[in-house]
């Protein structure tokens, strides 16, 4: 709405599609001001629409016990596989997937029995992503992130710890 005093109001009444990987869209509304004797001038009313983003909160901290791996052989009283959840607040666009940040390096410097750990991602038909960590040919852990915000971590092999440390 443009008022006679030159002020204007823009009301967004629903979501607007943005270009892929774009967080804002600029709409330029050309306006003409004309006076009583017909003189006119033009300008543009720029309206920037910022795309809201989803937020992730309440990420469950999980803990597994390496000494309960079958190959280690302790009392098997603690889990080596555990489920967790996180909460997502969606913006006007629905969340279509959850996966690890490709620019992050969560296993950098991680070793299992002296061998560097590498992480491989698999996109599954159900929309989940599975991350398999290996050291050479040995499985170290698997992380599956599901489309509903739940995840499962399964420890499959030992992880090297700092001297005199039991936790990583």
Model features per residue range: what roles?
Residues 1-168:
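Acidic/polar, solvent-exposed loop/turn segments
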């Amino acid at each position: 709405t443009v008022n006679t005093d030159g002020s204007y109001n823009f009301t967004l009444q629903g979501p607007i599609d943005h270009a892929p990987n774009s967080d804002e869209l600029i709409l330029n509304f050309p306006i003409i001001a004309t006076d009583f004797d017909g003189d006119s001038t033009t300008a543009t009313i720029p309206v920037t629409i910022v795309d809201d983003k989803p937020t992730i909160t309440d990420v469950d901290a999980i803990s597994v016990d390496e000494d309960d791996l079958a190959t280690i052989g302790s009392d098997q009283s603690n889990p080596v596989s555990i489920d967790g959840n996180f909460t997502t607040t969606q913006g006007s666009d629905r969340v279509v997937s959850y996966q690890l940040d490709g620019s992050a390096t969560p296993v950098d410097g991680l070793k299992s029995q002296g061998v560097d750990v590498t992480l491989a991602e698999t996109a599954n038909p159900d929309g989940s992503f599975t991350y398999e960590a290996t050291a050479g040919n040995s499985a170290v852990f698997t992380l599956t992130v599901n489309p509903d915000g739940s995840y499962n971590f399964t420890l499959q092999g030992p992880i090297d710890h700092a001297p005199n440390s039991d936790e990583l």
